[in-house]
Amino acid sequence: MAPYAPTDGISKLAIDQSKHFTEALKEALKSSADQQKVAAEKVSELVAGDANLNLGVVSQELRNALTGNDADAKVVAAHVVDDLMQKHAERVEAYLLPLLSVFLDLLGDKKPTVRPVAQEAALTIISSANKNSTIRILPILFDGLDRSKKWQTKKGALDLIAELSKVAPYQVGRCLPDIIPQVTDCMWDTRKEVKVAARDTMTKVCNVVGNMDIEPFIPALVSCLANPTEVPECTHKLASTTFVKTVEAPALAIMEPLLKRALAEGKTAVKRQAAVIIDNMCKLMDDPAEAQLFIPKLLPGLKKVIETQADPECREVATRAHETLFVAGGSMEVSEDELKVDYANIHKVVVESIAANPTAVKANIDSFVVDYVTGICYFLVVSRNFNKAVFEKEITTYIKAFMKPEEIKPLANEIRDRCFKENKSIFIEDVDCDEGIPDLCNCEFSLAYGGMILLNNARLRLKRGHRYGLCGPNGCGKSTLMRAISNGQLEGFPSRDELKTVFVEHNLQASEAELSVVDFILVDEDLKNTPRKEVEDTLAGVGFTAEMQAQGVGTLSGGWKMKLELARAMLQKADILLLDEPTNHLDVKNVAWLENYLTSLTNVTSIMVSHDSGFLDTVCTNIIHYETRKLKIYKGNLSKFVEQKPEAKAYYELESENVKFIFPEPGFLADIKNKGKPIIRLTNCSYQYPGTPKPSINNISVTCALSSRIAVLGPNGAGKSTLIKMLTGEVEPTSGQVWKHPSMRFAYVAQHAFHHIESHLDETANQYIQWRFQSGEDKELLAKETRKLSKEEKEHYKKPVNWEGEKRVLEEIVSRRKFKKSFEYELKWEKCPVDDNAWVPREKCEKWGWDKLLQIADDREAARANLQARPPTAIAVQKHLDCFGLGAEFGTHSRMRGLSGGQKVKVVLAAAMWLNPHILVLDEPTNYLDRDSLGALASAIKEFNGGVVMITHHNEFSSALTQETWNVEAGFLVIEGQQAEDKTKIEQKNEEEVTDAFGNVTKTKIKRKLTRKEKKAKDKARKEAEARGEYYSDSDEE
């Protein structure tokens, strides 16, 4: 038997049987302009009413009319196609779709009457055709974008692609890898109309991806395609986004052009960032077949970075991305040709399946339908749609004109079985939850933040009335997960209309600082209609007196601000309460109140992040734990969780094997022979804030030494932070004296630690530290009150002083040097040459009243000494950041805006320690750090050879580290447990290595102090050399 072949062309019999249609069409083509549409509708009705009419003849006759020279005939034929596709698309689309290319050419027709009807007919074909025929439509539209085509044709094709993205978004999404290059080329067209249309079309086709994470960046991505210079900035923007959806082929297709360009950028940082994004997006891809589509497109760029990039760290990241992409693609490296679905093979499957079915052979299915069905099957293969019902429905729609529906099913199954493989299923482990208690949510999602994959196909199931402790290491995404819930970014999580979710975090803004406490709550959009009495009663319930409710928000301490946030959340009557470090800034009494309040909420679910193990033990009914990018729920509180998972004992122990902080050695202090000798002293000091009726601090006297380990305790608002600010020089006492060693340096981490970096969030940690210390001085130190000169002080320093019998006016203090057991300072006088500079003892300068200027000079000299030993180069700064658990991924290559709260605190701590300080002052150091990091901090404090002063409500932390306690109550100080004087001898230590900006490492030579005998021999050698008339240098001895 001869092999089956579909009817190709039109037989003479078919033409004879269709003569009545041909005659009717010829008659319609002759109609006047005002009757053309009516005549076209009659022809359309004739086609619809004749089931035996050969539609191949219809297609051919319409093509002849559209390609002829008669403009009126073109208009009528276009109206016929438009009417048929609107009313009878299923029957005629296989025959009329090929005419789309003719309509594209007619968009540039010379006759103005032809162009609009051609546009209308083309739009109708696009909107009425089967959505799965998109893969057949697109090649026709791409042909219309060819450079040889008229600009009207190009613009029309672009408009049709945009329309296609509206009517068939899923199908367009699957075809994005083919669409984006074609439209991108048109963005560089010489014709303005084409460029504008291309940009608009690109935006619309990118929006079909339906990925809420990428949608905000689509304008930037589109702009990058037209302006490659924007690639670096766009890469940085995308690196700081939060991903909450599994990455599918359409999402990666949008990103691919940017990533390819970023990998080819000249800047190492951009290449590295692109590699990180590839690494993390591919980790979120579940289907290896989808990842394989991008292996031939992205792998070559990664290989080039690995082979040619000079920076070893960048090569390492690119290697990791290469491996992730390779694994995501099923550990197979395939070429682009191997991944293409062969249309000819699909056509062969359809033809052979028909040939194997006797009924189908007798049906004599024509080539128009075979080609159309092949196109639909081709798309189903490309999109890996394995649904039998869909497959059967699609084939039946077009073959039912030749066969009975019951005869088509075996044929459809045969075609389907030969085209598709079995779909792989993904097993998702469910979590252990209590049955019988209502679910608030049960959803599955993925989550990423910046350059890190946080969760992949994780399931979250929450029960009403349960209290969940969210546990995991710093940077794993605890706060990010809660923020994603609050912002409605999690797939399947109920909307805020169904489930009231309130996020309580440390983000109280100072812009409303003048509002009273009550008014601050009432301006909230969700609470503006709440009765004032209810607000006042709620505030009273958390401890706000009537007097406190009337005062400004800006006057509240950190603890009271957090209680205000909690009160606001209570008033919103949440179903789910999201608490980010709720015990931060709260004293013991208020922590107990919070525990009682949360446990009393039997109908409200709470999710909380806290590093206070006692709090989690008291409050939690369940623990949600991060495990290999999944969430696992354990029954019971923290102690029960640790019983089930012993490796989590770090939540109880203030020691860490996973994380280690290394504090730098304090700089050498002249005349300080042992660690117990005071290096700062406050005597009878008081401080009163402007406009307040009484002092915050009253008549205190304290000292600190290198051996000090001091805890500052007291209730919220007692004056602890004010005492610390006075100690560090952020404020000057209104009465009393402050003395400190001229070369002493402080490291100060404030209660609201982020204020140190809030104006630098678009920089990396490395860049921030380089900026802060690039001049050798700490730019934050320059902003302190003790460094600012008042008008009266400036006038005082301009008063003449008597020096060597002359009246002199100081211009500046230039430098400092050792003088006996003190210092002397080089003074530059006004209107005098440099040669007249004078070296004046410190005591003399103090007598003239220049204490503040001396302090400024001392700080500057101390900073300069550190700059010479350790210049703030990128390599040196990253080495320093490594000592605080912040690797290059987050320290050098990620902007601080994308870091977690704990990582930001590490940045602040590392920056504070850059100048090798002698005293470390920590205001609430346990805020935002996880247990591992707290353990690392505790170990570093124990090993630190400088003094430590800390404010903390974390009793476990302070009791393990301190021997002396300063109890502050209502502005008065009581000192307990003063430690014995440490007489440990101090030895000067120097940096063993210095790394310059080019990465060159220089070994430093440490000079040993000469013995008396060696000094005498050195003096004798010098005198002998001078007697011989020779120059003598110390280097001659080396």
Swiss-Prot record:
<dbReference type="GO" id="GO:0003746">
    <property type="term" value="F:translation elongation factor activity"/>
</dbReference>
<dbReference type="GO" id="GO:0005737">
    <property type="term" value="C:cytoplasm"/>
</dbReference>
<dbReference type="GO" id="GO:0005524">
    <property type="term" value="F:ATP binding"/>
</dbReference>
<feature type="binding site">
    <location>
        <position position="716"/>
    </location>
    <ligand>
        <name>ADP</name>
    </ligand>
</feature>
<dbReference type="InterPro" id="IPR003439">
    <property type="entry name" value="ABC_transporter-like_ATP-bd"/>
</dbReference>
<comment type="function">
    <text>Ribosome-dependent ATPase that functions in cytoplasmic translation elongation. Required for the ATP-dependent release of deacylated tRNA from the ribosomal E-site during protein biosynthesis. Stimulates the eEF1A-dependent binding of aminoacyl-tRNA to the ribosomal A-site, which has reduced affinity for tRNA as long as the E-site is occupied. Assists translation termination by stimulating the release of nascent protein from the ribosome by release factors.</text>
</comment>
<feature type="binding site">
    <location>
        <position position="927"/>
    </location>
    <ligand>
        <name>ADP</name>
    </ligand>
</feature>
<feature type="region of interest" description="Disordered">
    <location>
        <begin position="1012"/>
        <end position="1038"/>
    </location>
</feature>
<comment type="pathway">
    <text>Protein biosynthesis; polypeptide chain elongation.</text>
</comment>
<feature type="compositionally biased region" description="Basic and acidic residues">
    <location>
        <begin position="1021"/>
        <end position="1031"/>
    </location>
</feature>
<feature type="repeat" description="HEAT 1">
    <location>
        <begin position="93"/>
        <end position="131"/>
    </location>
</feature>
<feature type="repeat" description="HEAT 6">
    <location>
        <begin position="292"/>
        <end position="331"/>
    </location>
</feature>
<keyword id="KW-0251">Elongation factor</keyword>
<keyword id="KW-0648">Protein biosynthesis</keyword>
<keyword id="KW-0677">Repeat</keyword>
<dbReference type="InterPro" id="IPR027417">
    <property type="entry name" value="P-loop_NTPase"/>
</dbReference>
<dbReference type="Pfam" id="PF24984">
    <property type="entry name" value="HEAT_EF3_GNC1"/>
</dbReference>
<dbReference type="InterPro" id="IPR050611">
    <property type="entry name" value="ABCF_EF3_subfamily"/>
</dbReference>
<feature type="binding site">
    <location>
        <position position="924"/>
    </location>
    <ligand>
        <name>ADP</name>
    </ligand>
</feature>
<dbReference type="InterPro" id="IPR003593">
    <property type="entry name" value="AAA+_ATPase"/>
</dbReference>
<dbReference type="InterPro" id="IPR011989">
    <property type="entry name" value="ARM-like"/>
</dbReference>
<keyword id="KW-0067">ATP-binding</keyword>
<dbReference type="InterPro" id="IPR015688">
    <property type="entry name" value="eEF3_ABC2_chromodomain-like"/>
</dbReference>
<feature type="binding site">
    <location>
        <position position="953"/>
    </location>
    <ligand>
        <name>ADP</name>
    </ligand>
</feature>
<feature type="repeat" description="HEAT 4">
    <location>
        <begin position="213"/>
        <end position="249"/>
    </location>
</feature>
<feature type="repeat" description="HEAT 5">
    <location>
        <begin position="255"/>
        <end position="287"/>
    </location>
</feature>
<dbReference type="InterPro" id="IPR017871">
    <property type="entry name" value="ABC_transporter-like_CS"/>
</dbReference>
<dbReference type="GO" id="GO:0016887">
    <property type="term" value="F:ATP hydrolysis activity"/>
</dbReference>
<keyword id="KW-0547">Nucleotide-binding</keyword>
<dbReference type="Pfam" id="PF24987">
    <property type="entry name" value="HEAT_EF3_N"/>
</dbReference>
<dbReference type="InterPro" id="IPR034085">
    <property type="entry name" value="TOG"/>
</dbReference>
<dbReference type="Pfam" id="PF00005">
    <property type="entry name" value="ABC_tran"/>
</dbReference>
<dbReference type="GO" id="GO:0003723">
    <property type="term" value="F:RNA binding"/>
</dbReference>
<keyword id="KW-0378">Hydrolase</keyword>
<dbReference type="InterPro" id="IPR021133">
    <property type="entry name" value="HEAT_type_2"/>
</dbReference>
<dbReference type="InterPro" id="IPR047038">
    <property type="entry name" value="eEF3_chromodomain-like_sf"/>
</dbReference>
<feature type="domain" description="ABC transporter 1">
    <location>
        <begin position="426"/>
        <end position="654"/>
    </location>
</feature>
<protein>
    <recommendedName>
        <fullName>Elongation factor 3</fullName>
        <ecNumber>3.6.4.-</ecNumber>
    </recommendedName>
</protein>
<feature type="domain" description="ABC transporter 2">
    <location>
        <begin position="680"/>
        <end position="995"/>
    </location>
</feature>
<feature type="repeat" description="HEAT 2">
    <location>
        <begin position="133"/>
        <end position="170"/>
    </location>
</feature>
<feature type="binding site">
    <location>
        <position position="406"/>
    </location>
    <ligand>
        <name>ADP</name>
    </ligand>
</feature>
<dbReference type="InterPro" id="IPR016024">
    <property type="entry name" value="ARM-type_fold"/>
</dbReference>
